[in-house]
Amino acid sequence: SFLNPSRPVAVRARNNPCNRIYNVVMLALAPVMPEQVMAAGDDTTNAIGMGYQSEDAYHVYMEVVGGGWGACASADGADVVDAPIANCSNIPVEALEVEYPFMQVEEYGMRRGSAGAGQYRGGMGVRRVYRILDDNASFNCYSDRHRIAPWGLFGGQPGAPSRFLVERGGEVLTVPSKANFPLKKGDRLVIETAGGGGFGHPRERNPAAVLRDLADGYVTAEEAREVYGVDVAAHRG
């Protein structure tokens, strides 16, 4: 079958279809077990890598970057966490730059605007930006959630889909979710992973939670008013 192929079929990235099976189960159980399910999240193995040919060696970098988890009936989704079956740790930026001098990490943090709104909001995805410091480098990836956004449940809004970009001069190039993409000195490689879907209608969110999100930079005052129906000035006044 598609999910259990027989030899000698070539296979790769098995974690991604495993995550989609999990999503299907959650969606199927939602109508009968609403208290036990989660909205969709990034739910994928965002395997990103770069290769670089120096004068005396070939350097290979690979890392799995997390994203936002979906919300549930009692809690917001977790921020910037790997998929349940990825089991990968976060590599410190300083270690990356020491080990791979052909690149520099210019930004690394939560991706603003990626979380799906809801009574309980989804988790935030990741935004990471690499500056490429030399030619002879390439970007390689297999990922998912670039076309179909993580869905929300029971009125919750979807999270933002993932996207990989290369900023080259005044041009912005979109990199597919599975790709081998040549890089040039001066390129900015932008990795933005998906946020989680929300659970429940946004207008049912506790205003105190909306104000907390505003203070933490998860939402703007305009989003608090337009999406959640919370007038920040009135609550502060």
Model-predicted segments: where are they?
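Glycine/proline-enriched, intrinsically flexible loops and inter-domain linkers
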Residues: 1-237
